[in-house]
Protein backbone atom coordinates (compact mmCIF):
# COMPACT_ATOMS: atom_id res chain seq x y z
CA UNK A 1 0.00 0.00 0.00
CA UNK A 2 2.73 2.50 1.03
CA UNK A 3 0.11 5.17 1.55
CA UNK A 4 -1.05 7.83 3.99
CA UNK A 5 -4.53 8.70 5.22
CA UNK A 6 -6.61 10.84 7.53
CA UNK A 7 -9.22 9.28 9.83
CA UNK A 8 -12.18 11.26 11.12
CA UNK A 9 -15.93 11.80 11.24
CA UNK A 10 -17.07 13.83 9.39
CA UNK A 11 -14.28 13.53 6.84
CA UNK A 12 -15.76 14.57 3.48
CA UNK A 13 -14.87 18.25 4.05
CA UNK A 14 -11.22 17.47 4.90
CA UNK A 15 -8.49 19.33 2.99
CA UNK A 16 -5.75 17.02 4.29
CA UNK A 17 -5.34 15.02 1.07
CA UNK A 18 -5.07 18.20 -1.00
CA UNK A 19 -2.52 19.67 1.41
CA UNK A 20 -0.45 16.48 1.38
CA UNK A 21 -0.49 16.42 -2.44
CA UNK A 22 0.77 20.02 -2.61
CA UNK A 23 3.56 19.29 -0.12
CA UNK A 24 4.50 16.08 -1.93
CA UNK A 25 4.62 17.84 -5.29
CA UNK A 26 6.96 20.47 -3.85
CA UNK A 27 9.57 17.91 -2.82
CA UNK A 28 9.00 15.54 -5.73
CA UNK A 29 7.43 12.45 -4.20
CA UNK A 30 4.30 10.53 -5.18
CA UNK A 31 2.28 8.76 -2.51
CA UNK A 32 -1.41 8.01 -2.02
CA UNK A 33 -3.30 9.93 0.66
CA UNK A 34 -6.86 8.84 1.37
CA UNK A 35 -9.80 9.98 3.47
CA UNK A 36 -11.05 7.35 5.94
CA UNK A 37 -14.49 7.72 7.50
CA UNK A 38 -14.70 5.95 10.85
CA UNK A 39 -17.07 5.57 13.78
CA UNK A 40 -16.23 4.82 17.38
CA UNK A 41 -17.06 1.14 16.94
CA UNK A 42 -14.63 0.55 14.06
CA UNK A 43 -11.91 3.19 14.42
CA UNK A 44 -9.43 0.90 16.20
CA UNK A 45 -9.91 -1.86 13.63
CA UNK A 46 -9.65 0.48 10.63
CA UNK A 47 -6.48 2.10 11.92
CA UNK A 48 -4.72 -1.16 12.73
CA UNK A 49 -5.81 -2.68 9.42
CA UNK A 50 -4.51 0.37 7.53
CA UNK A 51 -1.03 -0.07 8.96
CA UNK A 52 -1.19 -3.87 8.67
CA UNK A 53 -1.78 -3.48 4.92
CA UNK A 54 1.26 -1.26 4.49
CA UNK A 55 0.15 2.21 5.54
CA UNK A 56 3.09 4.45 6.44
CA UNK A 57 1.45 7.35 8.25
CA UNK A 58 -1.91 8.68 9.36
CA UNK A 59 -3.47 11.92 10.45
CA UNK A 60 -6.21 11.73 13.05
CA UNK A 61 -8.94 14.33 13.31
CA UNK A 62 -12.10 14.77 15.38
CA UNK A 63 -13.35 12.82 17.25
CA UNK A 64 -10.57 10.19 17.41
CA UNK A 65 -7.48 12.04 18.66
CA UNK A 66 -7.86 10.71 22.19
CA UNK A 67 -8.55 7.18 20.93
CA UNK A 68 -5.37 7.30 18.84
CA UNK A 69 -3.34 8.27 21.90
CA UNK A 70 -3.98 4.85 23.43
CA UNK A 71 -3.28 2.90 20.24
CA UNK A 72 0.33 4.03 19.74
CA UNK A 73 3.34 2.05 20.98
CA UNK A 74 5.47 5.17 21.45
CA UNK A 75 4.65 8.84 21.96
CA UNK A 76 6.52 12.08 21.41
CA UNK A 77 6.82 14.39 24.40
CA UNK A 78 4.20 16.78 23.04
CA UNK A 79 1.74 13.93 22.40
CA UNK A 80 2.37 12.62 25.91
CA UNK A 81 1.63 16.02 27.43
CA UNK A 82 -1.42 16.56 25.24
CA UNK A 83 -2.76 13.03 25.84
CA UNK A 84 -3.97 13.35 22.28
CA UNK A 85 -2.54 12.21 18.92
CA UNK A 86 -3.15 13.73 15.50
CA UNK A 87 -0.21 12.15 13.62
CA UNK A 88 1.01 8.56 13.53
CA UNK A 89 4.14 7.21 11.86
CA UNK A 90 4.85 3.53 11.32
CA UNK A 91 8.45 2.91 12.33
CA UNK A 92 10.80 0.47 10.63
CA UNK A 93 10.25 -2.11 13.37
CA UNK A 94 6.49 -1.99 12.74
CA UNK A 95 5.54 -0.08 15.88
CA UNK A 96 3.44 3.09 15.82
CA UNK A 97 4.80 6.46 16.93
CA UNK A 98 2.17 9.00 17.95
CA UNK A 99 2.74 12.74 17.76
CA UNK A 100 0.63 15.85 18.23
CA UNK A 101 1.41 18.67 15.82
CA UNK A 102 -1.69 20.76 16.60
CA UNK A 103 0.10 22.99 19.10
CA UNK A 104 3.11 23.81 16.95
CA UNK A 105 0.79 24.37 13.99
CA UNK A 106 -1.29 26.78 16.06
CA UNK A 107 1.71 28.78 17.26
CA UNK A 108 3.12 28.96 13.74
CA UNK A 109 -0.17 30.44 12.55
CA UNK A 110 -0.24 33.05 15.33
CA UNK A 111 3.20 34.11 14.11
CA UNK A 112 2.05 34.14 10.48
CA UNK A 113 -0.82 36.41 11.49
CA UNK A 114 1.62 38.73 13.32
CA UNK A 115 -0.30 38.22 16.55
CA UNK A 116 2.93 37.31 18.39
CA UNK A 117 5.94 39.60 18.73
CA UNK A 118 9.60 38.56 18.65
CA UNK A 119 9.38 37.57 22.32
CA UNK A 120 6.37 35.33 21.66
CA UNK A 121 4.00 37.66 23.47
CA UNK A 122 0.59 38.57 22.07
CA UNK A 123 0.78 41.98 20.43
CA UNK A 124 -1.50 44.50 22.10
CA UNK A 125 -2.50 48.04 21.21
CA UNK A 126 -3.54 48.66 24.80
CA UNK A 127 -1.39 50.71 27.13
CA UNK A 128 0.06 49.81 29.48
CA UNK A 129 0.87 46.30 28.23
CA UNK A 130 -0.80 43.82 30.63
CA UNK A 131 1.53 41.91 32.96
CA UNK A 132 -0.54 38.75 32.45
CA UNK A 133 -1.85 37.71 29.04
CA UNK A 134 -5.27 36.17 29.63
CA UNK A 135 -6.37 33.53 27.14
CA UNK A 136 -9.90 32.11 27.06
CA UNK A 137 -10.03 28.57 25.67
CA UNK A 138 -13.50 27.32 24.79
CA UNK A 139 -13.59 23.54 24.65
CA UNK A 140 -11.83 20.68 26.43
CA UNK A 141 -11.57 17.98 23.77
CA UNK A 142 -8.69 16.67 21.70
CA UNK A 143 -8.15 19.95 19.84
CA UNK A 144 -7.86 21.91 23.08
CA UNK A 145 -5.48 19.35 24.57
CA UNK A 146 -3.16 19.73 21.61
CA UNK A 147 -2.62 23.46 22.05
CA UNK A 148 -2.57 23.99 25.83
CA UNK A 149 1.03 22.85 26.57
CA UNK A 150 2.66 24.87 23.80
CA UNK A 151 0.63 27.97 24.67
CA UNK A 152 1.83 27.80 28.26
CA UNK A 153 5.47 27.23 27.31
CA UNK A 154 5.62 29.66 24.38
CA UNK A 155 3.61 32.62 25.68
CA UNK A 156 5.33 32.73 29.05
CA UNK A 157 3.16 35.51 30.51
CA UNK A 158 -0.13 33.84 29.66
CA UNK A 159 -2.84 32.47 31.90
CA UNK A 160 -5.35 30.12 30.27
CA UNK A 161 -8.93 29.95 31.47
CA UNK A 162 -10.84 26.94 30.11
CA UNK A 163 -14.61 26.82 29.74
CA UNK A 164 -16.60 23.92 28.38
CA UNK A 165 -20.25 22.98 28.03
CA UNK A 166 -19.56 19.99 30.30
CA UNK A 167 -17.69 21.62 33.17
CA UNK A 168 -16.29 18.33 34.51
CA UNK A 169 -14.20 17.94 31.34
CA UNK A 170 -12.74 21.41 31.81
CA UNK A 171 -11.94 20.53 35.43
CA UNK A 172 -10.30 17.27 34.40
CA UNK A 173 -8.14 18.97 31.78
CA UNK A 174 -7.14 21.77 34.14
CA UNK A 175 -6.25 19.37 36.95
CA UNK A 176 -4.13 17.25 34.63
CA UNK A 177 -2.01 20.17 33.45
CA UNK A 178 -1.64 21.50 36.97
CA UNK A 179 -0.47 18.08 38.13
CA UNK A 180 2.29 17.93 35.49
CA UNK A 181 3.60 21.34 36.46
CA UNK A 182 1.61 23.97 34.58
CA UNK A 183 0.26 26.46 37.10
CA UNK A 184 -1.05 29.26 34.89
CA UNK A 185 -4.26 27.48 34.00
CA UNK A 186 -7.74 27.46 35.50
CA UNK A 187 -11.31 26.68 34.52
CA UNK A 188 -14.72 28.20 34.95
CA UNK A 189 -18.30 27.01 34.44
CA UNK A 190 -19.58 28.44 31.19
CA UNK A 191 -22.41 30.36 32.86
CA UNK A 192 -19.99 32.17 35.18
CA UNK A 193 -18.40 33.98 32.25
CA UNK A 194 -21.18 36.54 32.60
CA UNK A 195 -19.46 37.64 35.83
CA UNK A 196 -15.91 37.42 34.47
CA UNK A 197 -13.93 40.66 34.73
CA UNK A 198 -10.79 39.41 32.96
CA UNK A 199 -9.69 41.15 29.78
CA UNK A 200 -8.79 38.44 27.28
CA UNK A 201 -6.05 39.07 24.75
CA UNK A 202 -6.88 35.86 22.87
CA UNK A 203 -10.13 33.89 22.68
CA UNK A 204 -9.93 30.45 21.07
CA UNK A 205 -12.92 28.40 19.97
CA UNK A 206 -11.74 24.79 20.15
CA UNK A 207 -15.25 23.31 19.93
CA UNK A 208 -17.01 21.79 16.93
CA UNK A 209 -19.89 24.25 17.29
CA UNK A 210 -19.82 25.25 13.63
CA UNK A 211 -20.59 21.68 12.54
CA UNK A 212 -23.80 21.94 14.57
CA UNK A 213 -24.60 25.47 13.31
CA UNK A 214 -24.19 26.98 16.76
CA UNK A 215 -21.76 29.27 18.54
CA UNK A 216 -20.32 28.96 22.06
CA UNK A 217 -22.46 30.83 24.57
CA UNK A 218 -20.01 33.44 25.82
CA UNK A 219 -20.88 37.05 26.77
CA UNK A 220 -20.45 39.67 24.06
CA UNK A 221 -18.66 42.04 26.44
CA UNK A 222 -15.59 39.77 26.47
CA UNK A 223 -14.90 40.95 22.92
CA UNK A 224 -12.98 44.21 22.51
CA UNK A 225 -11.48 45.78 19.36
CA UNK A 226 -8.05 44.50 20.47
CA UNK A 227 -9.15 40.93 21.27
CA UNK A 228 -7.63 38.30 18.99
CA UNK A 229 -10.36 35.76 18.14
CA UNK A 230 -9.36 32.39 16.66
CA UNK A 231 -11.64 29.57 15.58
CA UNK A 232 -9.86 26.24 15.12
CA UNK A 233 -12.58 25.34 12.61
CA UNK A 234 -12.56 26.72 9.07
CA UNK A 235 -15.16 27.19 6.35
CA UNK A 236 -15.51 28.84 2.95
CA UNK A 237 -16.92 31.98 4.55
CA UNK A 238 -16.34 33.21 8.09
CA UNK A 239 -17.29 30.62 10.68
CA UNK A 240 -20.33 31.39 12.80
CA UNK A 241 -18.05 32.15 15.74
CA UNK A 242 -15.93 34.61 13.76
CA UNK A 243 -19.06 36.27 12.35
CA UNK A 244 -20.31 36.73 15.92
CA UNK A 245 -16.95 38.09 17.11
CA UNK A 246 -16.82 40.64 14.28
CA UNK A 247 -20.41 41.68 14.98
CA UNK A 248 -19.38 42.41 18.55
CA UNK A 249 -16.40 44.56 17.62
CA UNK A 250 -13.42 42.24 17.13
CA UNK A 251 -10.89 43.58 14.63
CA UNK A 252 -8.56 40.55 14.69
CA UNK A 253 -10.16 37.27 13.65
CA UNK A 254 -8.85 34.10 12.01
CA UNK A 255 -10.10 30.62 11.28
CA UNK A 256 -8.14 27.40 11.56
CA UNK A 257 -7.01 26.97 7.96
CA UNK A 258 -3.53 28.31 8.71
CA UNK A 259 -3.23 26.03 11.73
CA UNK A 260 -4.42 23.10 9.61
CA UNK A 261 -1.68 23.67 7.05
CA UNK A 262 0.90 24.33 9.78
CA UNK A 263 0.19 21.12 11.68
CA UNK A 264 0.11 19.21 8.38
CA UNK A 265 3.57 20.54 7.54
CA UNK A 266 4.91 19.21 10.83
CA UNK A 267 3.23 15.84 10.17
CA UNK A 268 4.90 15.81 6.76
CA UNK A 269 8.23 16.54 8.44
CA UNK A 270 7.77 13.54 10.74
CA UNK A 271 7.01 11.24 7.81
CA UNK A 272 9.51 12.50 5.21
CA UNK A 273 12.20 14.40 7.16
CA UNK A 274 11.53 17.48 5.02
CA UNK A 275 9.65 20.62 6.05
CA UNK A 276 7.46 21.94 3.21
CA UNK A 277 6.56 25.55 2.45
CA UNK A 278 3.37 26.67 4.22
CA UNK A 279 2.23 30.05 2.89
CA UNK A 280 1.70 29.09 -0.79
CA UNK A 281 -0.51 26.20 0.32
CA UNK A 282 -2.63 28.46 2.51
CA UNK A 283 -2.98 30.92 -0.38
CA UNK A 284 -3.90 28.11 -2.77
CA UNK A 285 -6.60 26.75 -0.47
CA UNK A 286 -8.03 30.22 0.15
CA UNK A 287 -8.25 30.95 -3.56
CA UNK A 288 -9.69 27.50 -4.28
CA UNK A 289 -12.51 28.21 -1.81
CA UNK A 290 -13.78 30.98 -4.07
CA UNK A 291 -13.21 29.46 -7.52
UniProtKB/Swiss-Prot annotation:
Keyword annotations: Amino-acid biosynthesis, Aromatic amino acid biosynthesis, NADP, Oxidoreductase
Pfam families, per the entry: Shikimate_DH (PF01488), Shikimate_dh_N (PF08501)
Catalytic activity as recorded in UniProt: shikimate + NADP(+) = 3-dehydroshikimate + NADPH + H(+)
First-level EC class: oxidoreductase
EC number: 1.1.1.25
Active site as annotated: 65
Residues that bind shikimate: 14-16, 61, 86, 102, 234
InterPro entries: Aminoacid_DH-like_N_sf (IPR046346), NAD(P)-bd_dom_sf (IPR036291), Shikimate_DH (IPR011342), Shikimate_DH-bd_N (IPR013708), Shikimate_DH_fam (IPR022893), Shikm_DH/Glu-tRNA_Rdtase (IPR006151)
One GO CC term, this protein: cytosol
Subunit structure: Homodimer.
UniProt function note: Involved in the biosynthesis of the chorismate, which leads to the biosynthesis of aromatic amino acids. Catalyzes the reversible NADPH linked reduction of 3-dehydroshikimate (DHSA) to yield shikimate (SA).
PANTHER family in the cross-refs: BIFUNCTIONAL 3-DEHYDROQUINATE DEHYDRATASE_SHIKIMATE DEHYDROGENASE, CHLOROPLASTIC, SHIKIMATE DEHYDROGENASE
Protein name: Shikimate dehydrogenase (NADP(+))
Amino acid sequence: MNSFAVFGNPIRHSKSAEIYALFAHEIGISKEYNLKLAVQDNFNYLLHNFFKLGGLGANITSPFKENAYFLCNQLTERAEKARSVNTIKKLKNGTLLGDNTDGIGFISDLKRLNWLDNNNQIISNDAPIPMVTNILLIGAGGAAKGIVPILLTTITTCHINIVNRTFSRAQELTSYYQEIGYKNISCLPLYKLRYDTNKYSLIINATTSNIHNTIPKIPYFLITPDTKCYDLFYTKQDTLFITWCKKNGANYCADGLGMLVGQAAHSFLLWHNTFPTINPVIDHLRSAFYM
